[in-house]
Amino acid sequence: MPGMIDGHAHVMINDDFGPVERDLDITDISYNAVIVSERFVRDGFSTVRDMGGPAFGLARAINLGRVVGPRLYPSGAFISQTSGHGDFRDRADAGFSINDAGDLSNFERMGIGNVVDGVPEALKATRLNLRNGATQIKIMGGGGGSSRFDPIDTTQFTEDEICAITGAAADWGTYVAAHTFTDRAVNRLLDCGVKTFEHGLFISEETMQRIAAEGGYMVPQMWGISPDLARNPLMPEDKIPLVEELGQQYADFGRNLLKNGVKVVFASDYVGKFADAERARRYEIGWRTQTFDSNFEVLKQLTSTAGEMIAMSGPRNPYQAGKLGVIEAGAYADLILVDGNPLEDITVIGGTDQWFDAPEEWEPIDTIDFVMLNGAVYVNELD
C-alpha cells in the first residue's frame, strides 16, 4: 500500500508543554525530533505536514540524507493573536499594560509560534515563515483545550487580519490552515479563503456543507471525542465531566462529515512527550475506524485524500515530481508491505484500541515488514 501521511503533527513539540515552555531549548527539541522522524518512517509514514515549529533544518537534513525521516511539509511558527491559542506566555509575562507585554514565551524564542496583533504584524509573521521555507501557513483561528488563556469557544483574529494572511500566502502560491472548533470561527475563516480546518469538532452540518462546497478539507484529531480522553493522566479532574459530555454530544461528528461530502485527512496532533504522541497516533488510527465506520475511509484519509491536500501548496511544494499517497505510474515510490489486510484488520498498520494502557516504550509494528521512501528501502524484514 502507499506510504501513509499524517496531515497534522508536531515533530518539534516533542515534550509536555511545561518543559517546552520553561526548561528546553532548540537543541533539546531538535534531538528529540530526529528520533520522532525515524519512528514515523518505521511506522510506515512517508510524509508529515508539520503544523507548528522550527522544522526547516530537520527537513533539509532529511532531504540531504543525513537524518532518516519522512518528507516534511513545514508550516513554520504558528501564528496567533495575543490571548490566542498560540499565546503560551505565563500570566506574569504578559502583564497588564501593552507597554510591558513584550516578553516572549519560549515557544516564540524557539520558533514554534508567533504572537501578533493587527495586519502589519500578521503580514510580517506570514512572510517570515514563507521566507524560511514554509509550504503552508498555520494560524490559530479560535480557542483551544491545551492553552491557558483562551476558552475553546472564542473566535480569534479579525477578518482583516485573516484575509491579510491568506492574501500573503496566495501571493506565494500556497494556502492557509487554521486551528478552529466553532461555526463562527470556521465561517470567518472561509470568508477569507482558508482551505484546511484543524479539529472543527463542534461545527454544524450547515458549516460542513459550506466547507465541502468551497473545496476545503477537515483535518480532525478524532481522539478529541474519544471516551478514553477522560482517562488521560494529565487531564484536570474538573474537566473530566465536560470532556465526557462533549464526546457523547459530538459522537457522530465523523459520520456527519462524510454525509455532507467533506474531504477528511488523518491527523494525530498530539503534543507532549514523543512516546505519548506515538501511542496517540496508533490509537487514532484504530479509533477512526469506529468514528467513520470504515477501514477503507480511514485508509483514504491516511493516503490519497491527504496527498491531494498536500498538493495545494502548489509552487511551494518541494516534492513536485509525482503524486503522494497513491500507487500509480509517475507517483513517488513510497511503499509499505503489510503482513495482513488493513481493509479487514486495521491493527496490521498499527491501529489499536489501547491508548493510555498501551506500552510506554515504543516498539516497531511487527506487521509492517518493508518500508520504501522515494525508491530507497528503509525497512526490510522480508528475509
Task: Give residue spans per PLM region.
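Divalent metal-dependent hydrolysis catalytic cores, especially in the metallo-beta-lactamase
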Residues: 32-58, 69-78, 134-147, 175, ...
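Histidine/acidic-residue-rich, glycine-tolerant segments that coordinate divalent metal ions
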Residues: 63-188, 196
